[in-house]
C-alpha cells in the first residue's frame, strides 16, 4: 500500500499531500502536466518524489503513471472562479479529467483512491445557519467552480459504484497555510489584504483549513481501512471582519480596512467587473461569486472526519 500516485502535485493541496506521504515513508509518483517546466517541478524534486508527466484530459498519459501503484490521490482539478469559456476551461476538465483518472486507476488495479472534492460540493450552511454535513449537496449552484466540483464528485461516486472502485472523498473548505507556489482563489484575498488593497471588509464568512491538516485528512483516509464516503475538513468558520481584526492585531502597520461593505455595494462592484471582463480584463469578482458566497452564513459539521479518521 506504500506505492502511490498524487495528481496535481505542484498545487497547494497536492504538494502538501505529497510532502506528508514522503515523510511517512511512501513511494510517491507525482504528476504534473508539464514536467519540463521548472516552476512545476523544482519544489517536487526537493522532496525526492518521482515526477511523471500526465494530463487528465489525455487518458493515454494516465495509464503509464498508474502502473504498479497501490493507491491514487486524485487531487488535480481546475481551481478558478471565472473563465471566458467556463464549460471548456473549468467544468469539463474537472468532470472529465477526474473520471479519466479514476478509470485509469481502476484499469491498472489500483487498490484505493482518495478523491479531492470541496465543500463547494456541499454548500454553505443549512436553514438558519445550521451546519452542513456529508449528507448535503450543492446541487442548485450555477457558480462554475461549485458546479464543477459538485458534478465531478457525483460522477466519481457513480463510477465507483459501477466499477467497484474503493473510493473515499475529502471535502475541504478554503485551504490556507504554507507550501503554495502560486496563489489560489483561497489565498489571493489574503495577499490583497496584506498589501492594503482591500478598501472595505467584504460581507463573507470563510470556512478555513490549513493545507497541512488537509494533507493529514487525505493520508488518514487512505490508511483507515474502515473509512467510507465523504469527509468534510474545516478548522473554523470566520467572518471576514474577524480575520481583518486578527491581521490588525498581528501587525498594526498593515493598512487594513475598517468599514464593512454592504452587500449591494459588492453586487455593484461585481457588475462593474463583469462589464470590464467584456473588454479583456479578468474580473476580480463575479456576480456568480457574490450569489454563491457573500452575505450567507457558513457552517460545517466535521464530526465524521474526527470520529472516523481521527483527524486533527
Question: What is the role of each PLM region?
Answer:
Residues 83-84, 138-142, 181-182, 188-209, ...:
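A conserved pocket-lining segment of Rossmann-fold NAD(P)-dependent short-chain dehydrogenase/reductase
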Residues 74, 78, 83-143:
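Conserved Rossmann-fold NAD(P)-dependent oxidoreductase catalytic core, especially the SDR/UDP-sugar
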Residues 141-168:
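Active-site Tyr-X1-5-Lys
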Residues 35-96:
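NAD(P)H-binding glycine-rich loop region in Rossmannoid oxidoreductase-like domains
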Residues 2-26:
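N-terminal Rossmann NAD(P)H-binding glycine-rich loop of SDR-like oxidoreductase domains
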Residues 3, 217-285, 302, 307-308:
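Mid/C-terminal beta-alpha module of Rossmann-like enzyme folds, strongest
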Residues 162-166, 177-189, 221-231, 254:
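Glycine/proline-rich active-site loop of Rossmann-fold NAD(P)-dependent oxidoreductases
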Amino acid at each position: 500500500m506504500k506505492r502511490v500516485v498524487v495528481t496535481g502535485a505542484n498545487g497547494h493541496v497536492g504538494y502538501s499531500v505529497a510532502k506528508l506521504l514522503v515523510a511517512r515513508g511512501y513511494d510517491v509518483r507525482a504528476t504534473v502536466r508539464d514536467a519540463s517546466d521548472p516552476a512545476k517541478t523544482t519544489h517536487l524534486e526537493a522532496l525526492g518524489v518521482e515526477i511523471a508527466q500526465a494530463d487528465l484530459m489525455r487518458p493515454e498519459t494516465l495509464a503509464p503513471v498508474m502502473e504498479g501503484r497501490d493507491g491514487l490521490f486524485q487531487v488535480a482539478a481546475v481551481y478558478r472562479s471565472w473563465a471566458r469559456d467556463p464549460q471548456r476551461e473549468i467544468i469539463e476538465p474537472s468532470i472529465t479529467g477526474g473520471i479519466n483518472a479514476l478509470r485509469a486507476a481502476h484499469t491498472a488495479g489500483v487498490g484505493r483512491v482518495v478523491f479531492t472534492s470541496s465543500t463547494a460540493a456541499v454548500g454553505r450552511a443549512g436553514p438558519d445557519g445550521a451546519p452542513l454535513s456529508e449528507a448535503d449537496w450543492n446541487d442548485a449552484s450555477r457558480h462554475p467552480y461549485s458546479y464543477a466540483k459538485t458534478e465531478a464528485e457525483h460522477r466519481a461516486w457513480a463510477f465507483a459504484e459501477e466499477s467497484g472502485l474503493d473510493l473515499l472523498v475529502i471535502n475541504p473548505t478554503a485551504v490556507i497555510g504554507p507550501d503554495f507556489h502560486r496563489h489560489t482563489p483561497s489565498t489571493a484575498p489574503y495577499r490583497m489584504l496584506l498589501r492594503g488593497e482591500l478598501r472595505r471588509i467584504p460581507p463573507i464568512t470563510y470556512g478555513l483549513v490549513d493545507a497541512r491538516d488537509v494533507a493529514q485528512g487525505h493520508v488518514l483516509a487512505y490508511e483507515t481501512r474502515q473509512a467510507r464516503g465523504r469527509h468534510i475538513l474545516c478548522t473554523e468558520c470566520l467572518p471576514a471582519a474577524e480575520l481583518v481584526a486578527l491581521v490588525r492585531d498581528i501587525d498594526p502597520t498593515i493598512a487594513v480596512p475598517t468599514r464593512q461593505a454592504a452587500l449591494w455595494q459588492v453586487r455593484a462592484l461585481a457588475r462593474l467587473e463583469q462589464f470590464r471582463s467584456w473588454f479583456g480584463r479578468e474580473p476580480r469578482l463575479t456576480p456568480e461569486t457574490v450569489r454563491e458566497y457573500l452575505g450567507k452564513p457558513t457552517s460545517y459539521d466535521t464530526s465524521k472526519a474526527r470520529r472516523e479518521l481521527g483527524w486533527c
